[in-house]
Amino acid sequence: MLLVIDVGNSNIVLGIYDEERLVRDWRVSTDKSKTIDEYGILFHDLFRLADIVFTDVKDIIISSVVPTLTGVLEKLSRQYFKISPYVVGPGIKTGMPIHYDNPKEVGADRIVNAIAGFEKYRTALIIVDFGTATTFDYVNKKGEYCGGAIAPGLAISMEALFMKASKLPRVDIARPPSIIAKNTVNSMQAGIFFGYVGLVDGIVQRMKGEGKENPKVIATGGLASLIAPESVTIEEVDEFLTLEGLRIIHQRNK
């Protein structure tokens, strides 16, 4: 079995693959203060509930945008699984040309998504990933990563409103009943939710205009299923895109 680990600023997503089949996945909160042993116990408990033991895992690949946790999970892999993991970054074969001023600056998760998207759809793509930040990535018809855009995520935007406006409460991210809201909570939700839908559609439409390839637009990430139904540009939600990308990169580096 293959263990794939996607480390984001807010969540760590784990997946277990048996060949090409995703047999189990988990999403846990990212905690930079946790030690190797604390993460080891967490992994053990998750695996035990799924009737999986550490020795079932024969290989590990990690994608991380949190440098401090990259090292922790590398050490965990060696200590608990007795495996030297693959880490997405310089030296890893991706099979995708990266057209960026400094390719090392592109987040590992963005490249992983691009690889998975092109492998699956074989056409020009815009990939919208709803994470701590929301990223927009363009892949052309030749399967080349062309760049993209980064915007503050939904949760960051809502938290900033609460932190900076003293009379506004902290509220959940949700679709309100109407854009013309009748109370403060719904008003905040209306501004963030519908404003974000507009942001997504606006950026995607501008990218389509520049790219001129009629790209397919897919969304992934924790909040993709919330925004996608209201979007006029998102065509499909692929919640396991990043995990699938890690599996593909592992295959290309075996």
From Swiss-Prot:
GO cellular component annotations of the record: cytoplasm
GO biological process: coenzyme A biosynthetic process
Protein name in UniProt: Type III pantothenate kinase
Active-site feature positions: 109 (proton acceptor)
Family per record: Belongs to the type III pantothenate kinase family.
Stored InterPro entries: ATPase_NBD, Type_III_PanK
Keywords for this protein: ATP-binding, Coenzyme A biosynthesis, Cytoplasm, Kinase, Metal-binding, Nucleotide-binding, Potassium, Transferase
SUPFAM superfamilies with a match to the protein in the record: Actin-like ATPase domain
Organism this protein belongs to: Geobacter sp. (strain M21)
Biological pathway: Cofactor biosynthesis; coenzyme A biosynthesis; CoA from (R)-pantothenate: step 1/5
Predominant place of localization: cytoplasm
Gene3D superfamilies documented for this protein: 3.30.420.40
Catalysed conversion reaction: (R)-pantothenate + ATP = (R)-4'-phosphopantothenate + ADP + H(+)
A GO MF label: metal ion binding
Classification lineage: Bacteria, Pseudomonadati, Thermodesulfobacteriota, Desulfuromonadia, Geobacterales
Co-factor requirement: NH4(+); K(+)
EC number(s) given by UniProt: 2.7.1.33
Primary role: Catalyzes the phosphorylation of pantothenate (Pan), the first step in CoA biosynthesis.
